[in-house]
């Protein structure tokens, strides 16, 4: 309840015209009992659709569940988040505990300046939140260890909650739901690890990594020897991904490498996640000659 109340959307009412102030009139015991009974045979209430204006003149659809459904989504999030955090890629920064846009930008600057990766692949996923494949998402949750069938059934019902004035969606996870950012990270976590497996997480026979200590006393794993050995003994190309929600960049060392990973990533997103890339918003940038927007 406290986490829902902190959310700026908490004072916005759903289709039943109730908000967080109505929930605050209930005792803790009443809230717990309400959630328990709803989950016994859960059916979400219709979602309110609201169009949010964008700078380019277009609008972004926001799906606002009822306050009661947001409360249940928060309960589920608090159970799932620790499980997912243990499996998420370490350079994904969006909507995660103790991570922010500053961390994402700092990582991007490190790759550009210290690692000398001056070519960046910018890929914009067309309408990401509106095009998430429900069946694929459920399979990804199962792979992460979320295998309680009752819980999966509840989440599946949330995904297919009726949007008032639109109907029942067959894909997508509406922006405005408390659970949506976590589900988005579950979907794109597979992309993170796929890109990482091409270089950063590529397995080697010998363990080259060493534990080193910063002046601050913080320990970290140094992979520089591993990367040096891979560069000398393989034809693999250096590449690193930095992601914040559905906004991500892949850093490469040459234009040729960037072209290959650009084509491969578009194909992978289409075949694995059934997502399309916006051709007019996706490009390769030489950072020594041009700038790139991030967040």
Predicted regions and their residues:
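Short alpha-helical scaffolding segments that buttress acidic/His motifs in well-ordered protein cores
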Residues: 1-4, 75, 154-159
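Charged boundary/loop elements
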Residues: 2-9, 78-91
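Conserved polymerase palm-domain catalytic core
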Residues: 46, 90-91, 96, 103-287, ...
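Hydrophobic alpha-helical hairpins/lids featuring a short glycine-rich hinge
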Residues: 53-57, 61-80, 86
């Amino acid at each position: 309840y406290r986490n829902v109340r902190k959310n700026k959307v908490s004072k916005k009412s759903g289709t039943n015209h109730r908000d967080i102030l109505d929930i605050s009139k209930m005792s803790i015991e009443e809230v717990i009992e309400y959630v328990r009974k709803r989950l016994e045979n859960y059916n979400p209430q219709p979602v309110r659709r609201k169009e949010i204006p964008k700078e380019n003149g277009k609008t972004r659809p926001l799906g606002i569940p009822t306050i009661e459904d947001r409360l249940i989504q928060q309960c589920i999030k608090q159970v799932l988040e620790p499980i997912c955090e243990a499996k998420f890629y370490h350079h994904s920064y969006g909507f995660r505990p103790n991570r922010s846009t500053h961390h994402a930008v700092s990582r991007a600057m490190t790759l550009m300046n210290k690692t000398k990766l001056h070519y960046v692949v910018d890929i914009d996923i067309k309408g990401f939140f509106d095009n998430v494949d429900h069946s694929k998402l459920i399979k990804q949750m199962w792979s992460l260890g979320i295998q309680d069938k009752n819980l999966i059934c509840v989440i599946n019902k949330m995904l297919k909650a009726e949007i008032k004035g639109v109907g029942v969606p067959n894909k997508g996870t509406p922006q405005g739901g408390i659970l949506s950012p976590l589900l988005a990270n579950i979907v794109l976590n597979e992309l993170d690890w796929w890109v990482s497996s091409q270089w950063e997480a590529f397995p080697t026979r010998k363990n080259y990594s060493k534990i080193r200590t910063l002046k601050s006393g913080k320990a970290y794993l140094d992979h520089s020897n591993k990367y040096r050995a891979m560069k000398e003994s393989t034809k693999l190309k250096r590449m690193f991904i930095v992601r914040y929600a559905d906004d991500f960049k892949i850093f490469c060392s040459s234009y040729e490498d960037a072209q290959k990973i650009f084509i491969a990533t578009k194909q992978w997103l289409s075949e694995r996640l059934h997502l399309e890339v916006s051709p007019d918003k996706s490009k390769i940038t030489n950072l020594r000659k041009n700038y790139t927007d991030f967040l």
